[in-house]
Amino acid sequence: MKFKKIILALACLSSPLYADQDQQLKSEIQRLQHQAEDLQAQLNRLQKQLANHKSSQQKHEQQAATKPAEPQSKPTVKSGAAIEEKYHSSKVEVHAPDAHPESISFYPTALIADNRVVTYIAGTPVVSSPFLGDRPAFDGSDYIVNISSINRDVRLLQQRRRLYRAYQKIGYPIPNMPIISLSGKTEPAATFNNPFRSTNTDGDITLGSSELDVAAALNENVEAYIAIAYDESPPAIGPRVNNSAFNLNMGFVNIGNLDKSPLYFTAGQVYVPFGRYSSAMVSSPVTMNLARTKTRPVIFGYKSQGDTGPFGAVYGYRSDTTLGRSGVGGVNLGYIFGFDNDINGEIGGGFISSVADAGGMQSTGSNVGTTFGGFGSITNGNENVRKTKAADVHGHVGYDRYNLTLEWVGAIQSFRPQDLSFNGQGARPQAAQAELGMTFMAFNRPASIGVGYQWTKEALALNLPKRRYVGVFNISIWKDTVESIEYRHDIDYGITQFANGAAPQGFVNLPTLGTGKSADTVSAQIGVYF
């Protein structure tokens, strides 16, 4: 009797255990059934591929049988003849972990074709392109390297927005990986001229500019940009190839998303948003030579979220000049307009609290130990100058194939005579530009012509001409290139006019004297963009 009770107790205790084992066995059976179904599906697919392959092979054999028999003596293959290679197409698969890239410390990925690894991807994939968004123009004018140096941060914002909108339009999600845009240019040039102060014709063949740009769109809100440029200016001593060095032309971080907010922020080394300096010429306009300012500011800006509308920016930076307070600031305002896709343009103006940091003010190109070399010159200049305010007004309008550019920039107060003078008085340098252009097709290639008139006032010490007449012809013979030829006629200040600028302590610069003469220059350039 006791044994029966013990047996019954053991049976009661073991029944839950058997139930659990039965459940596990059922789950295992279901899993094996699913695997068997998957294997059967793969087997059916392979059998279908085999049947298709046999069918195509039989068809090929039938076609070969209907061809006339080839002669037994085959012609000898000539040296250098191309040997036909056999190729086939395969589907490429991405083999990656199931986990999200940000949830694991390492993200090994591979591209597989024909059951072989084509390439490995270790880390986050990077997409590279010389432009963001639209298909590039034939002449490469929309490559990042050719974006205007003024407000380049805003133009990159707009490009990134167009790219993301294109993804969304076809149903793709916004990329969660950085898009690295690599772009660059090389522009060799030849010039022939008869300068103001020489009776001999001069000429030169040189590398006008060379630059490599990197724009990294990290996500929909942040972008970084670096431009490394070749320094073409000759050294003070020694052959000019000794100065063939690359330096940081621009580098900045931009934070903004025009789809979410019209506000943006930029910090780094950039050209401050003062002036426009647009030109189709080979040579830089006198407005740019006078006032374009590259420094290291912080910029708070506003850009209309539409293609047209108002824009503006305020900025501040530390000045290179040492007299008085070091801080310099400015403001830029404008409006972009367009009517019926035929007329478009931009008007704007700006103010800067010191124009003394402009490139043409810091360096005038004078030889060592001669005339004023710019406030930044060690031998012919001095940074201990008063900060002088300046303003800019510009406008650009395009209609069909025609475009017109107008701009004026200048100091709105006089420099101290010991800082920058004209005819013995404090100079108030100014510059203006008017340019008319037209695009057309020449020899079935995109081309353009442009004519311009430029003018300066009280800018003799900066080695700028009093008046300039200039014309250019541009054509894109090959894709991503622009071939240009320019004629420039400069007229100097009068022989009774003289100017000077700040000199190192204890020294005096030689005065810059007007000649009343004219100078003619012919320039030819080929620009290659990528």
From Swiss-Prot:
Keywords: Coiled coil, Signal. Residues 1-19 form the signal peptide. Residues 50-81 are annotated as: Disordered. Residues 20-66 form a coiled coil. Disulfide bonds: none annotated. Belongs to the UPF0422 family. NCBIfam families: LbtU_sider_porin. This is UPF0422 protein lpl2888. The lineage of its organism: Bacteria, Pseudomonadati, Pseudomonadota, Gammaproteobacteria, Legionellales.
